[in-house]
Amino acid sequence: MNPDNYLYLSALLFTIGAAGVLLRRNVIVVFMCVELMLNAANLAFVAFSRMHGQLDGQVVAFFTMVVAACEVVIGLAIIMTIYRARRSASVDDANLLKH
């Protein structure tokens, strides 16, 4: 399969994720859209590394997945803290943790 198709798919996934981050108010949906954007970047890294015959992009994608796993743990803990305090999962309630 042509590597350009993977790059087009990556751009489409990143655009969908960015639109979700900008347009949605629910923290869980925004969180999933950020993860979609990270996966789109991983797909682009792997496609570029495949095009050039090197493993650098795949190594970067692996480390990005490790960072994304840590982000999931910390992000869900923050979301649960906000939900317990306000019984809402809205982006507007994120300023609750300032105090």
Curated annotation (Swiss-Prot):
Regarding the membrane, this protein is recorded as:
Multi-pass membrane protein
> Which cell locations does it reside in?
Cell membrane
Q: GO cellular component terms?
A: NADH dehydrogenase complex; plasma membrane
A GO term (biological process) for this protein?
ATP synthesis coupled electron transport
So where does this one cross the membrane?
A: 3-23, 28-48, 59-79
Drop me one GO molecular function for this one.
Answer: quinone binding
Please provide the record's keywords in A-Z order.
Cell membrane, Membrane, NAD, Quinone, Translocase, Transmembrane, Transmembrane helix, Transport
**Catalyses which reaction(s):** a quinone + NADH + 5 H(+)(in) = a quinol + NAD(+) + 4 H(+)(out)
Pfam families named in the record? Oxidored_q2
Q: List the disulfide bonds.
A: none
* InterPro entries from the UniProt entry: NADH_UbQ_OxRdtase_chain4L/K, NUOK/Mnh_C1-like
Q: What EC number(s) would the UniProt record show?
A: 7.1.1.-
Name the job this protein performs.
NDH-1 shuttles electrons from NADH, via FMN and iron-sulfur (Fe-S) centers, to quinones in the respiratory chain. The immediate electron acceptor for the enzyme in this species is believed to be a menaquinone. Couples the redox reaction to proton translocation (for every two electrons transferred, four hydrogen ions are translocated across the cytoplasmic membrane), and thus conserves the redox energy in a proton gradient.
What HAMAP family does this protein map onto?
NDH1_NuoK
| Family, as annotated | Belongs to the complex I subunit 4L family.
Query: NCBIfam families annotated for this entry?
Result: PRK05715.1-2 (NF004320), PRK05715.1-3 (NF004321), PRK05715.1-5 (NF004323)
Q: Share what the entry says about its subunit structure, partners included.
A: NDH-1 is composed of 14 different subunits. Subunits NuoA, H, J, K, L, M, N constitute the membrane sector of the complex.
Name it. Answer: NADH-quinone oxidoreductase subunit K
Q: Give the species.
A: Mycobacterium sp. (strain JLS)
